[in-house]
Amino acid sequence: MAKMGKKYSESIKLIDKNSLYTPSEAIDLTLKTAKAKFDETIELSIRLGVDPRHADQQVRGAVVLPHGTGKKVRVLVFAKGDKAKEAEAAGADYVGAEEYLDKIQKENWFDFDVVVATPDMMGVVGRLGRVLGPKGLMPNPKSGTVTFDVAKAIADIKAGKVEYRLDKTAIIHVPIGKKSFGEEKLAENYNVLMEAIVKAKPAAAKGQYIKSLSISSTMGPGVKINPAKVLA
C-alpha cells in the first residue's frame, strides 16, 4: 500500500487542483498518472444540473463507443422459442427464461454484466426488479435492452455499448476504455459519450446542464474538465 501511496502522491503533483483542463489535456494527464501495473480502466464522472427525484429530469440512455470499453461483457438474455435461438446465434452468453429467474433468486447468481429481454418476457424479469434494479441490471427500453431485435442488442453490447444513468446525487459514472487504448481512442470514445449525454438533456432541466466533470483511472486521481468545453 505504501508503494501505491507513493505513486499516487507523485501523480497528484502533475495535476493543478485549481485548474479546469480541456478534454484532451485531461485525458493526457490521466494516462500519465495511471501508474498501476494492470491495464487501468478510464472513467468519466459527470455531475448534471438536474434533480433526479423528478421523473421529467431523468437522464438515461445508451451509446456504442467506437472502440468499446476493453471489457468482455457477459450478456444474459431472457427469451423463448425463435428469439432464444436468435440470441444464442448472436453470441449471448446465457439464454433462457424461468430457469434463470430461479438461478438468480435461489442461488444469488450474478455472473453477467447486461440483461436483455424480449417484451413478452418482462413479466418474468419484472419479478427480479428488487435484485436487478439496485445493481443497474434491469432491462429498459430506453437503453435498448427490452426489444424483440435481440441480435442487434447483443451485437451493440458486444461492440462496446455502454449505459449511462443518473445516480441519486445527479452524477453519471461511465467507463470510456482502458489505459492501453491511448489518447486518440479514448478521446473518440469520450466525444461520442458526451455528445449523447448533451443530446439527452431533459426539457425540464433549467440552468447549467453540465455542472462539472472529471476523468480518472482506476487507481489515479481525478482530473477536472472545463464544463464549458465538453468536447475534445
Curated annotation (Swiss-Prot):
GO terms for molecular function: rRNA binding; structural constituent of ribosome; tRNA binding. The lineage of its organism: Bacteria, Bacillati, Bacillota, Clostridia, Eubacteriales. This is Large ribosomal subunit protein uL1. GO terms for cellular component: large ribosomal subunit. Part of the 50S ribosomal subunit. The keyword RNA-binding applies. Keywords: Repressor, Ribonucleoprotein, Ribosomal protein, RNA-binding, rRNA-binding, Translation regulation, tRNA-binding. Belongs to the universal ribosomal protein uL1 family. One of its GO terms (biological process) is translation. The keyword RNA-binding applies. InterPro entries: Ribosom_uL1_bac-type (IPR005878), Ribosomal_uL1 (IPR002143), Ribosomal_uL1-like (IPR023674), Ribosomal_uL1/biogenesis (IPR028364), Ribosomal_uL1_3-a/b-sand (IPR016095), Ribosomal_uL1_CS (IPR023673). The gene is rplA. It holds the Pfam family Ribosomal_L1. Binds directly to 23S rRNA. The L1 stalk is quite mobile in the ribosome, and is involved in E site tRNA release. It comes from the Bacteria. HAMAP family: Ribosomal_uL1_B.
